[in-house]
């Protein structure tokens, strides 16, 4: 049994050998812990953590109303001044060194990793837990980029696992605000060679070959692993990514050549991680401010990240052995054996390949817009104009909501022991994030402002289990002689088989941006 959570740690006094008293206390403690564990989880808000960066600004505190604290030299908590350059607000993180702390409710003061250790699949869902183990799979931040973000790149899952024993870092940027002249550098404006890129990093001429985007509020950009990227000039961004901080700094706009501003660089280490082709515009989704140029399709994830084995021709199909390519209004979505046509298992339910795979949003009047569907996460933009009733069982995973505009409330139906029914209310303001655990049955999203926009992020359940963490994996190797060793191995039906100890390891901390 895992250790009790912070708020349930009693202090046992020495009882002078009184065994009866000790027994009574232990029995009471057992009953308390059993009742504690049976309490149902609720929506979690976490205390945001500031990350100071030379390219940061003041908007996280001034525009989003963030209040950050840090420890001084004596270990005392002090408020971070609004004049400090803060580049990131870590909203939800299970990263070892950075471990989000629950802000409210009866689990306040406990960390996300402690929740994962204690409640396991009740937090993330059974399929997600079976694959990721006790590692929470996503990292969520708000970014304030006013200076120049370094030119950088992130690895994919395969390389990250092989070299760093970590998850890779796919991410999506949602532009909450963009000042005139703000830029995002994303990929290259033409195909380049590794040698040319290397030389330009040393000569300070990298900008000439970078693809430049002038983003507007409401735009979304999928930052695929291997994509060289940077930004500058006044951007407020909501970022959803894999639970990894593997960042390789390639060029730092000349700061690396000044001893006063130099930071660690990783050009040689990352030279073979980079996609040197021309930037795929399908990774950039223009928002409503572009008018007729606005994108109707989600960001196109590179084909190399698909694991489609059913033969679907649709470019957005992300089905593995089971098709999960966008069934709406319930029903099991799968592929025909003949022709590989995607359809819903229940009659009368419309199936949209590549659409939002969760609940009853109305696509006709653009209440929801799919921003990206990838093996690592799906992100949907919700223009919340009317209350929505959400059934979490249709997701089979946790749900994260980031409020990027306006204000909403998450209302959870409750019932007291005497049968009295009520509603528990959780307010979500612009710049706030909330985690809906998989254990919750249903809830309502209710707008508190006419212009309320939410980002909804889920991790797509994975059917297979990483053999690295699967305790049920066969211990034998082909063509090996195990005579005499069989008795020391567990049978398949042995009740003492250990539970998973954790999946992809805790996020590896890179050098940051």
Regions from the PLM with identified roles:
Residues 11-21, 30:
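Short, often N-terminal, low-complexity regions
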Residues 26-192, 252-305, 379, 475-488, ...:
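Transition-metal
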Residues 135, 143-148, 157, 167, ...:
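Ligand-binding loop in jelly-roll beta-barrel domains
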Residues 145-148, 170-171, 175-197, 385-420, ...:
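Glycine- and acidic-residue-biased ligand/ion/polar-headgroup-sensing regions
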Residues 201-250:
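Loop-centered beta-sheet repeat module
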Residues 210-221, 413-440:
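Short acidic-glycine-tyrosine-enriched beta hairpin
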Residues 306-363:
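Histidine-centered metal-binding segments
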Residues 407, 422-513:
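Generic C-terminus detector
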